[in-house]
Regions:
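Catalytic Walker B motif of ABC-type/P-loop ATPase nucleotide-binding domains
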Residues: 172-176
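Helix-to-loop junction immediately C-terminal to a conserved catalytic motif
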Residues: 55
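Conserved ABC ATPase "signature" region
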Residues: 118-143, 191
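ABC ATPase NBD Q-loop/coupling interface
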Residues: 64-84
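The feature captures the beta-strand-to-loop junction immediately N-terminal to the Walker
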Residues: 40-42
Length: 249
């Protein structure tokens, strides 16, 4: 029986084992629609496995994973989950470096188009407006004709977030966006993700505590595949168990 929930994402009692190692161990997590949530934890805590689980790359051995209270993600494949409205941005940008920002955005337009057919076809007015709005939202409106390979690392991350937005996701899964960014890019990225929350549910997996602090959102600490603590960053940072296993003090 599917639990009654209006949450964007609902994970209950999820466990995943690889060759006897429990990557997730009775993990339970719930995110409200439009929420921004940071997920932190030491290496091997289960953060990446959790994202793999939500996107259908990994199947749970036990547990429930619901999207919008009605879609059982454990029964769907990666394409079906993406089409429902769950988008993932990996740590390393996948921007095509030989084409422009505009053309990268065009490739990402949702709809039944093959990638290179998208590039060649004439955009309608609605498409152009949407792409311009997204470029402006991610701070790339002045770089729209710039070749992808000439962008800074931070700009590539923003472009990839823009490409995800064009797919109209309900949930954005963002994996370590601050890695390799300058301080100013890091703060701008935090501002962007705060702005996206509300319109989208945003999960950010991150190691940079200054970046997490800038997000100003609820924090979930994972350890050994389950939730160790939740709350504001100041709250979890003062938790003795978190200090012991994560902060190393």
């Amino acid at each position: 029986m599917i639990p009654v929930t209006r949450s964007a994402l609902y994970l209950d009692g999820v466990s995943v084992a690889f060759d006897g190692f429990k990557a997730l161990n009775d993990l339970s997590l719930e995110l409200a629609q439009g929420e921004l949530r940071a997920v932190i934890g030491p290496n091997g805590a289960g953060k990446s496995t959790m994202l793999d689980l939500i996107t259908g790359k990994t199947r749970p051995d036990t547990g429930v994973v619901l999207f919008l209270g009605q879609h059982d993600l454990t029964s769907l494949d990666e394409v079906e989950i993406a089409n429902l409205g769950i988008g993932r941005k990996f740590q390393k940008p996948s921007v095509i470096e030989t084409i422009s920002v505009w053309e990268n955005l065009e490739l990402a337009l949702s709809g039944n188009r093959s990638p290179w057919r998208s590039v060649m076809q004439i955009l309608n007015l609605q498409d152009r407006r949407l792409m311009k709005d997204v470029a402006d939202r991610v701070g790339l409106s002045d770089s729209i004709d710039q070749i992808g390979g000439s962008l800074s690392h931070g700009q590539k991350q923003w472009l990839e977030i823009g490409m995800l937005l064009l797919q109209e996701p309900e949930v954005l899964l963002i994996d370590e966006p601050a890695a390799g960014m300058t301080d100013s890019e890091t703060m701008k990225t935090a501002e962007l993700l705060r702005d996206l929350a509300g319109d989208h549910t945003v999960i950010v997996v991150e190691h940079d505590m200054e970046f997490v602090e800038a997000l100003g959102c609820k924090v979930t600490v994972l350890h050994e595949g389950c939730v160790l603590a939740e709350g504001s960053l100041s709250h979890v940072s003062s938790n003795n168990e978190v200090i012991e296993v994560y902060l190393g003090r």
